[in-house]
Amino acid sequence: NKKKLYALTQFYESGLFNHLQSLKNAKTVILFGSMVRSDWYSESDIDLFIYGDDDDFEIGKYELKLKREIQLFNAKNKKKLRKMGMGLVQNIIQGYFIKGTIDNLGVELKCLNS
């Protein structure tokens, strides 16, 4: 899909992917939403999920570079992930994994149902 490839190329060339991969205390980082589904348009935001600590994420820098708002969803621990709700979490895990794997969330996802 050309639209998806274009978006991913922009994120890579801006340095966003490298920056997200370098976040020391982020266990999992996932791009999801319209950018991954390829149904984005010029005003669409960028949906990102970070499991773990996102304190080092330079959100403003990349919003300026990409000329798009970044909608950040964060869960620092199991309790926060549980509060996000299963529907949102299912949407997130269908996204593009920038860092980590689904295994990083496996135990935590089971806890959502408990």
Model segments located where?
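Acidic Asp/Glu-based divalent-cation binding sites
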Residues: 45-47
